[in-house]
Structure formats: structure tokens, C-alpha cells
Amino acid sequence: MFQTAIGVTIPFPEKVREGYRIMDGALRASVSFEKLDAVIREFISLIEEPMFLALHIPLPEGATEDMSVYGEGTGSVYEQVMYLDQCSREQMLSVYNTFGGIFLADGVSQFAIASHKSGDEMFVQLFKIVDFLGEGRLRYTALLEKHGIYPSDGLLTAWDVLDKEHPGKCRLVKVLGTTIFDAVERLKEFGLYAAGVIER
């Protein structure tokens, strides 16, 4: 059965399937949670240096411990977009080794890893839906298929099973006593900075 992060709950998880589809401007993938870490690590190994990390962090008043989400693009949560720029591969792996556990488990935040040089980006969104972005996005079909994730014209992601009668739930969680907000404060010591506020 499709696995989800501990910070999210979806209705009818039995309906959700792994797979990917090509969309306008994005390669979208539904990745079961137990595979997501390996896919991210391999993406880091493939993209060109230098790299950057982007974090989308809900403002505290929007980060409830049980936030209902009805589907893609719904909700009225504002989030702070933050960046850690000009990372080498070694530096990005160090950041991910330290904070990847909370990035993956948390339900209320989103994150992306990308190349400054090529623009290739892996954006891990709410419910851990993955979008590969950039002109080279289609090359990552091979990465997905290596992990048993194949094209699907009728792909059902977590977003596709949500509605107002059956919302998903996104939660702020702790991993080893650390929340995403704690991780942000620690990453500021390494150069993480705020770039602006957007509405989710």
C-alpha cells in the first residue's frame, strides 16, 4: 500500500498509486514515502553544482497541528519562502543528512533542491507530491523508473482524492525533538535567508 509521511493523513490511501505524469512545465510524481529519501539523494548526486535549498515554511499562525487541506491550491495559509544558496554537493548532502528527516516527516512545510546552473529542481510539496521542474526535467524519468515509479496516464496522487467532504490533514511534527521551525533557526547559522511571503 502507498505509504505517507507521519505528518500527513489522506482519505482513501488505497486509491493512491505510485507513478508519474508529464504536465505543462512539470514532471509530477507520486512517490511512496519509503522511496522518497533515496530518490532525493540520487537527485542531489545528479544535478550540477552549485545548488540551493528552498524552504516554504507556514507562518506560525497558519501552522496548526492539524491543518485541513481540500486539494491542490486550496487553503489560505501564508508561507515564508527561504533559501540557502551556493551549496556544493557535499554541503547539500550535509544539510540533507542533518535535516532531511524533519523535511520528510513534517506535514505543513514544503522544500525544494535545485541547481543554480541548470535550473533543474525537485520540489517536494504538501502530501509529498513531487514536481521536477526546469528545462531538463524529463531526464529524471529514468531516476523514477530506477525506483519502480513508472508513467501513468490515470495517475491518482494524494491531491486527487481530497475534497471538502474528505480533506487531507497536515501536521506539524517533531523528529528527535526538532520541528521544522527549529530546523530553520539552525539553518540560519549557515546562511538560510528569507526571500518573501506567498499565499499557498
What do the predicted segments below correspond to?
Residues M1-I129, L133-R200:
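Structured alpha/beta or helical-core interaction and ligand-binding surfaces enriched in interleaved
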